């Protein structure tokens, strides 16, 4: 059995094809890495965003390369940079850049107000660093930066999964969900009451699964 894997990193996008041997161990048939190179230049020093559609295009090209060379691949695994989010519309299309884990909007002081990350810590008793997806989303809500057509959000690798499968609503693994912040790792769910307190419409939250 052959398996292909794609990892969407911040600086590179990597892929690998593995074959399961008779002894049960995996053998690497081929690995390949391409530059990400999709950062968007903005006038804000604190802003770290990337062209999401260009990232997906590069990931698709890499996966297509593997599938053409190894047509008997049976499974595809996706991993990628944690914490960041992209917004999607009702059809499952990406309608925003990728707000990466390096984005610092959660640390900005608006006038005499404390940074959003500190407000979350004080009001919700949650530690969520700037760059965590839900910190980014709360900031975007308050500053009218959420795209008008957006209805949900997810990580870049989960969006790639949506792109490949035609899924319209985001479905993310618990490991990715935890990286967005406001996640109860014992109950395996988002802390909806605290999110609502911060002004988040919980209907926007992606579905969460525990299985791979």
Task: Annotate each language-model stretch with its function.
Residues 99:
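Surface "functional belts" at beta-alpha junctions
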Residues 40-43, 108-112, 182-184:
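Short, charged, surface-exposed secondary-structure boundary motifs
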Residues 103:
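Carbohydrate-associated surface elements
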Residues 1-96, 122, 149, 196, ...:
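N-terminal glycine/serine-rich phosphate-binding loop of ATP-dependent small-molecule kinases
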Residues 33, 108, 210-212:
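Acidic-glycine-rich active-site phosphate/pyrophosphate-binding loop
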Residues 8-10, 121-212:
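Gly/Ser/Thr-rich active-site cleft segment
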Residues 116-120:
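FAD-binding glycine-rich core of flavoenzymes that anchor FAD
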